[in-house]
Swiss-Prot record:
Any one GO BP annotation for this protein: electron transport chain
Domain 4Fe-4S: 32-90
Residue stretches making up the 4Fe-4S ferredoxin-type domain: 105-134, 135-164
Keywords: 4Fe-4S, Cell inner membrane, Cell membrane, Electron transport, Iron, Iron-sulfur, Membrane, Metal-binding, Repeat, Translocase, Transport
Oligomeric and partner information: The complex is composed of six subunits: RnfA, RnfB, RnfC, RnfD, RnfE and RnfG.
GN (gene name): rnfB
Record-given protein name: Ion-translocating oxidoreductase complex subunit B
Localization of this protein: Cell inner membrane
Organism: Vibrio campbellii (strain ATCC BAA-1116)
């Protein structure tokens, strides 16, 4: 047998042994999670922005499962509150944040002031800032949630939160506001009024 063939067989055997050990360990030491926390976490927007007062969406989901309010997530908006209310079987509350008057903002980096320290990149929970050490940084506008966690760590104050320009794509279209009348209900109402006459 050649040396290469022996090395391949030995590596394959080691891989099989370590794979079996990892497989056994994943079954033996499996952590059982609360299924309601997983369901709540799947409803939350996963921006990890911290605007709810928790360090991310998973800790907030755990807090909701333990009885905290369901209306603390600004990126999720009223739609998320309603989904959480349906899941938890509680009344849908108004958002704890003023969502209507708050204009959506995104971070903007003044590149002439940026020193490339990467502190904003480290603070961004959604990786919306790109750049490198001692290089210019920029914000990916479509990824930015407007949480403004990147503003405070900047030593040169080169980050500004600017309002997002309203376009046809970002306009709050009320597409579900079209009233739909159930024909059978209308017909029954007409029969009732006819029988009263």
């Amino acid at each position: 047998m050649s040396t290469i063939l022996i090395a391949i067989i030995a590596l394959a055997a080691l891989a099989a042994v370590f794979g079996a050990i990892l497989g056994f360990a994943s079954i033996r030491f499996k952590v059982e999670a609360d299924p309601i926390v997983d369901q709540i976490d799947s409803i939350l927007p996963q921006t990890q922005c911290g605007q709810c007062g928790y360090p991310g969406c998973r800790p907030y989901a755990e807090a909701i499962a333990n009885g905290d309010q369901i209306n603390k997530c600004p990126p999720g908006g009223q739609a998320t509150i309603e989904k959480l209310a349906d899941l938890m079987g509680v009344e849908a509350e108004e958002s704890a944040h003023d969502l209507d008057s708050k204009v959506k903002t995104v971070a903007f980096i003044h590149e002439d002031m940026c020193i490339g320290c990467t502190k904003c990149i480290q603070a961004c929970p959604v990786d919306a800032i790109v750049g490198g050490t001692k290089a210019l940084h920029t914000v990916i506008k479509d990824e930015c949630t407007g949480c403004d966690l990147c503003v405070a760590p900047c030593p040169t104050d080169c980050i500004e939160m600017i309002p997002v320009e309203t376009t046809t794509e970002s306009w709050k279209w009320k597409l579900n506001a079209i009233p739909v009348v159930n024909i059978t209900d209308a017909a029954n109402a007409a029969n009732v009024t006819d029988s009263i006459k």
